[in-house]
Structures are given as C-alpha cells and as structure tokens.
C-alpha cells in the first residue's frame, strides 16, 4: 500500500529533518513550527524504524496535552499515520491502517524522577528553555539515559 504524505516543511525545518547528528535542536521563535517539525521527525522515524519507541518530554503534563497532542494528531494524519492516544498511560500509539508502528511515551520534565524504567530510540524534548536550569539539566540527563536504541 502506497501512502501519500501531505505534510510539508519550510526550508529551516527541512534542513533540521535532514540532520544526521545524534543530538539535534530546532531553535526558533514563537510560532515557527518547532513542535510541528519535531512531530514530523517522530512520524518519519516510525515509518523507517517501526516498533522502536520514542519519548516526548514537556515541562508539565498540561503542556503535553495542549501542545503535543493536537500537533501529533495533525502531523500523523498528514504523514499517513493514525494515532491512538492512551491518556491514562500517557502514551500515543501509531498505526498505518491496522499495522502497529510504535509508541511514544510522554513524560513531564517537572518530575524528572518519573523518567526511568523504559527504553526509547528517539526523544522529542519540547519547551526545555522555560524550565529552571537545574531542573532542565536533571531532566535532560534522565532523558538521554533512556536513549538505548540509538
């Protein structure tokens, strides 16, 4: 089955998506599409690396709900994927039709002690700059410790 990808990226976003570095950052202003391009990278990863789970990290769970969930629903649809949001588990499951592609585990960086006990191949770290530096550093170190499949 051939899937038509409808999502588009601007030039800076396209450059970001083509980076091969282990750790990459899309640093831009308000409304520039940082979360959008991160979600594009997430969906692209599920197409090329099925069943390698990923993580999404935001300062708080309400930010995950308000920023990530609507964006990933839209981007996944545009990229030929369907998402099933498991609110109670803080997970997003990705499918191509009925074929399972992977799961994104969502965690709050505000409580970095919850960033333990799982393996992921990629991480989307959103809004890290709004956290106090010490909390951001602690969360970052916990997140990169979860990256076991890279």
Description of each model-found segment:
Residues 1-150:
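Phosphate/NTP-binding elements of NTP-utilizing enzymes
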